[in-house]
Curated annotation (Swiss-Prot):
Pfam family, one: YidD
Function text: Could be involved in insertion of integral membrane proteins into the membrane.
A GO cellular-component term linked to this record: plasma membrane
Family according to the record: Belongs to the UPF0161 family.
Keyword terms, alphabetized: Cell inner membrane, Cell membrane, Membrane
Protein localization: Cell inner membrane
PANTHER family in alphabetical order: MEMBRANE PROTEIN INSERTION EFFICIENCY FACTOR-RELATED
NCBIfam families: membrane protein insertion efficiency factor YidD (TIGR00278)
UniProt name for this protein: Putative membrane protein insertion efficiency factor
Membrane topology classification: Peripheral membrane protein
Chief location bin: membrane
């Protein structure tokens, strides 16, 4: 069940990367991008902890942050 949920969440993020994101100018201040960070964290830590980490990362990604290199721990 966990693997199915991980696959579903990653597929949703990849859909966003391929179908939605190209229609907007790049705005992520981090490397890897927030969507790539989300995929990596979900695969590494599972659907709940990984999605929570991704959400916190997205909340940090704003005009007031420096950004830069911030890999999944």
């Amino acid at each position: 069940m966990r693997k199915l949920l991980v696959s579903f969440l990653c597929a949703c993020i990849i859909f966003y990367q391929k179908a939605i994101s190209p229609h907007f100018p790049p705005s992520c201040r981090y490397e890897p991008t927030c969507s790539q960070y989300a995929i990596e964290s979900i695969k590494k830590y599972g659907p709940f902890k990984g999605a929570g980490m991704a959400l916190l990362r997205i909340l940090r990604c704003n005009p007031l942050c420096k950004g830069g290199y911030d890999p999944v721990p």
